[in-house]
Amino acid sequence: MKRCYLYLFILIEMCYLSELSAKSCGKVFKGNDPAVRYVGRTLVSSDGSVSFDWVGTYWETRFTGGRLSLIVSETGTSYYNVFVDDELHRVVKVCGTDTLINVVSGIDKRLHSLRMQKRSEGEFGKTTIHRFVLSASGQLQASPTVRTRHIEFIGNSLTCGYGVDGRHRDEP
């Protein structure tokens, strides 16, 4: 029983310290910050976190400071396209609970647009964004334009591109 309490105490300390270290690295914003726009099916929790699992769901914002990280939880393993200033910057793998993920770093500190789009099917995991972490000089700013029209492709894996990255059908 004592061992159980010890493990619980260590787990709580690790969660607290990861949140503390994220806060000490820069500015922290909730997942539902008004400067972040989500497109797709999402669920906003009372603590300000945002959850989603549908492929194609994305969030976008603008930011300064040259660095942006996320504190996220994932029920499985998901992959995301990260676009900076409308150019594919990288592909990010998200897994684990209360994980600090570096989305963008090493770019200049001017204003940049950022979009992060889920590319994995929902069956491979649900993502919850708890916090955005920016550099100490960083700020989030809302995207200036709201798209009034979207093109949606509805169909099977041939039309929608399911499995274009996998070597076999069980890969996300």
Predicted regions and their residues:
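Bacterial Sec-dependent N-terminal signal peptides
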Residues: 1-27
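N-terminal secretory targeting modules
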Residues: 20-154, 158-172
